[in-house]
Amino acid sequence: MVKNKGKKLFSDSIQLEGHQGEINTGKFSHNGEYFCSAGNDKTINIWEVFDKKCQNVNSIIHAHSSPILEIAWSNDDDYIASCSVDKRVTLWDIYNGNYIIKYKEHDNFVYSIDFCDNLICSVGEDCSLIINDIRMKTKSNSYQHKYQLTTCKFSDNNNIFFGGIDNQIYKYDIKKGQIDKNFILIGHNDTITGLDISHNNKYLLSNSMDNSLIIWDIQKTGNNLSKKLMGNKHGPEKNLLRCKWNNDDTLVSCGSADKIVHIWDVKLGCIIKNIYGHNGSVNEVDFNSLVPNIISSVSNDNTSIIGYF
């Protein structure tokens, strides 16, 4: 086990307790210093990762009126955006816990959210992709799909990948205000629940209720499917299980209903590590940018775990 000499956890595995319900989302800040979690108790918790006790430094109680389904950090880590069953997307100041803007453009549950520069994208039950510029109080762009959308991810500040219950992944060009009809990724057999872009911006990772992860080469035209990974599980509760690349794009991980954090070696195409500790579905995982062999996980068991792997 190789640890960063400058930063280290106070224990090899830390269980964070502070939520009173299932945790749906949990992400490290871009600088790796903080961890944010949120879920069915409508609370957003922020933890200082390398503090002697991994201290909870801020709790935003009743951040939404219904369960929170996903959060996203701004590029500078000064803000967090959250989306909820209450149909709202909210932008928060992490230092004082106050909301800055509440966006109310969605007509139903908002399932997924992502942040890039000044833009926030969100998708939901109303079949819409909505893009908000945090410098404005009204939406800057939107796209109406035929089916419910469950996940979205910026690849840069001009393109957004999104997917939903039609099992396909689409690319939306922000400047053109339309999807690329020549770029539709087909390969999953059930709802897409999570997306993540590799750090080199060459590959897209997707998680699906068909119990597979797919790595797509998004620089190719034609057959984009690069590799299919198996081993994760989706349960009858149909949680939106998210997925993640590690810092150097050699490993991937994802949420899994079997209570296990699975880590795949991308080159080998197989699971190289299983991490146990949760008593419920693992809904989201994240790799720490500051110390590459630290991973986080959040679960239906009301806890988050941060530890070395």
Predicted regions located by residue number:
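Intrinsically disordered, low-complexity acidic/Ser/Thr/Pro-rich linker and tail segments
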Residues: M1-Q20, T25
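Short C-terminal beta-strands that terminate individual repeats in beta-propeller domains
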Residues: D12-G18, D51-A63, C83, Y99-E105, ...
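Canonical WD40 repeat/beta-propeller blade segments in eukaryotic WD-repeat proteins
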Residues: G21-K27, S66-W73, N108-F115, K146-S155, ...
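Short coil/turn segments that connect the beta-strands within blades of beta-propeller domains
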Residues: N31-E33, D76-D78, D117-N118, N157-N158, ...
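Conserved strand-to-loop turn within each blade of WD40 beta-propeller repeats
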Residues: S37-D41, S82-D86, V123-D126, G163-D166, ...
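WD40-repeat beta-propellers
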Residues: I44-V49, C83, V89-D93, I113, ...
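Structured C-terminal portions of repeat-based eukaryotic scaffold domains
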Residues: G177-V291
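Blade-level signature of beta-propeller repeat domains, shared across WD40, Kelch, NHL, RCC1
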Residues: N283-F309
